[in-house]
Amino acid sequence: MNKITLGMLGGTPCTISDAAPNHSILITGISGSGKTCHLQRIELDAIQTKHLIIVLDTSHSHDVDRIYNPIRSDYEANCKRISVSQEGIDLRLFSSESSPSQQPNRIINDVTQMIASSSNLGKRQTKMLRKAVASAYTNYTPGKNALQLIGSNLINLGSDGEDLYDRLWYIFQNDAALSGGSTFEKGNINIIDFSDFDPDTQKIIAELVLKSIWNNKSSLLSGNQECLIILDECQRLYLGPNSMICQILREGRKFGLNVIMATQSLSIFSKPTISMLEQAGTKLYFQPSQSDLQRITKSLQQANQANWKQTLTHLRRGECVADGILQVGKSTIRRPLILP
């Protein structure tokens, strides 16, 4: 199995051990700690090990001028940039290769829940949305824009439907779900740019993209290839208990799907969300915020917590503490390591 290089120790790659519960990674650290530069190095290395890389960029973190300068040339030579608002992306909302004979009601319910959950819709609004999705499913043909079709159906449901349309109008006003839009390229870092959308729309479209990846994983991956989904500034995405991120963390490894989630601080999340994020088998802790320091120190589970607190406080830019089941050369390491 091709492994992801987390960093180098004395010239030897430090990777995630096959004994780890999954190959997902949680990265935390304050702004300026070097976590995004490190993340981009991991992405470029993963391309060399034949991973399919899909980046969901909600904050311009992967704009050309923000790629780590020492690797920028190689990085740009190996990436495909997709502007969702300008080019659209083929989401295949109404198809699922994992179950071609899937009952229409299942597909309709999945699409409805993806939009409703990430939009915090109530029961009445969800019921109305389901009617619009069902009608769109019935009338959909290849080449049509699935989201615009759903929006048109909402308008036809009367004043309440129009109100819901107005609430979600931006997702119906672009080619985000255009059949025949951009698709992912194997062998490249696929950067999906959501930065033109407002935060609420980002959550909805990103959730639909993740669902599409999940539903069509077999055609995306070949042989033992794995897909690595990059979620920088992951606090911008929908992280509820029924979210696709939660599902990938729970079940993704057996299908070759893993996520790398990066955020400045865990303290902004609720306890259930933190527990969900910490299902990632490997953590990379860059210089933490003061609000995270005590939590991370305790999570390292070492006898001398005072030393780890000091180590975390004095991490230099680009340095991190890796925690998980790691592999260095032929050795399996079950204790935290400092990666330069």
Language-model features: locations:
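Short strand->helix junction
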Residues: G32-S33, P199, L266
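P-loop NTPase motor core of the ASCE superfamily
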Residues: C14-I16, I25, I47, F269-P340
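Active/binding-pocket-proximal capping segment
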Residues: C227, L266, Q279
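P-loop NTPase motor domains
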Residues: H38-L257, S270-P272, Q310-V328
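Basic- and hydrophobic-enriched, low-structure N-terminal and domain-boundary segments
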Residues: M1-S33, C37-L44, T49, L91, ...
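H-loop/switch region of ABC-family ATPase nucleotide-binding domains
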Residues: T263
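A short acidic, often aromatic-flanked loop/helix-cap motif at beta-alpha or helix-coil junctions
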Residues: N22-H23, Q86-L91, S291-L293
